[in-house]
Regions:
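Active-site residues of response regulator receiver
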Residues: 52
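Conserved phosphotransfer cores of two-component systems
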Residues: 42-44, 66-73, 92
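Conserved acidic carboxylate
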Residues: 8
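Acidic catalytic/metal-coordinating carboxylates
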Residues: 33-36, 59-62
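Hydrophobic/aromatic residues positioned on beta-strands within the core alpha/beta folds
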Residues: 77-79
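Receiver (REC) domain active-site loop signature in two-component systems and cognate sites
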Residues: 55
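Two-component/phosphorelay signaling modules centered on CheY-like receiver
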Residues: 11-29
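Alpha4 helix (beta4-alpha4-beta5 surface) of REC/receiver domains from two-component response regulators
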Residues: 62, 83-100, 105-109
Length: 122
């Protein structure tokens, strides 16, 4: 079972992502900010990280920089409500950039693509 670390400050979004990806057959680990995400990485490495950008404590860009330095092999999907960050050179370190939407179809498709999966089930 593939493991996904979801880093999202909005609790309702975290719950939604947990439920959707767990139902799709993934093991889902949650973190509310970048600092929590780095602590989770000390415990075990996921196969993929879904990372929000605008968060308190440690934002997604700082978090991604630290992850890339220490865990370069873990792919990151940036998932944010702000399309403007796509032009930020730091976002180029991510495998994919997905603007948040009520429909999780694009995010789910990117997860499957980045993990090298086809179809709708991991």
């Amino acid at each position: 079972m593939k493991k996904i670390l979801v880093v999202e400050d909005d609790e309702s979004q975290r719950i939604l992502y947990h439920d959707e990806f767990a139902d799709a057959g993934y093991e889902v680990i949650l973190a509310a900010n970048g600092r929590e995400a780095l602590k989770q990485l000390d415990v075990g490495k996921p196969d993929l990280i879904i990372l929000d950008i605008v968060m308190p404590v440690m934002d997604g860009m700082e978090t991604m920089g630290r992850i890339i330095r220490e865990y370069r092999e873990i792919p990151i999907i940036l998932n944010t409500a702000y399309s403007s960050y796509k032009d930020d050179f730091m976002s180029w370190g991510a495998e994919a950039y997905v603007v948040k939407s009520a429909d999780l179809g694009e995010l789910k498709a990117k997860v499957r693509e980045v993990l090298g999966e086809s179809g709708s089930h991991p």
